[in-house]
Amino acid sequence: NAILNYIHETGNADFVNGKMIFLQGSPEMKEKNGIKIGRLSGISAHYVPNYLQKNRLPSWETNCLEDWDTKVNRIVEETVQENMTVIAGIPSWVQMYFEKLNAKTHLKIGDLFKNFQLFIYGGVNYEPYRAKFENLIGRRIDSIELFPASEGFFAYQNSQKEKGMILLLNSGIFYEFVKADEFFVEKPQRITLKDVEVGINYVMI
């Protein structure tokens, strides 16, 4: 939905014709007591929309590598000559990928991948990484922030014109909140979405 919303807002869908990479943990699943388990970022690999699958990198074999340094080196080899248009992942992982590309080619990422248009990230606060990424990329590109967690997919950035993310209300998630300034009291009052007020900071439970 985040990517479709971006296409709707900007009118830009050219990136779907290029190569895309989602830096993530191994997508291999294990079974324990009859339940399939795996890394959250790896599980998400099984739910990439069909219209993005055909141009997706890296290869399955590379994606399943456990050693992260070996994996990123292999990803660099698989992508350095490709027409990369979308790059996604946790900022610290993507930073490592970009730095290895830069070390290999001595090029800014925006010069190496001339059609690189969209950076998708989540998992951590991006602000500490922003200056480093701007330097590594060397030019402005659009970005989409996501709010994924093991408990559910909560929100995504729905505008290139404003900061912030829109909370997903139709994903089978029941939300509860506590006012941020009451979070550390012994019995804070929990409220549901209908009682949330604009302009007040909340902790999502």
Language-model region placement:
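Conserved adenylate-forming
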Residues: N1-K36
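Active-site glycine/GP-rich loop and adjacent strand/helix microenvironment
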Residues: K19, K32-I205
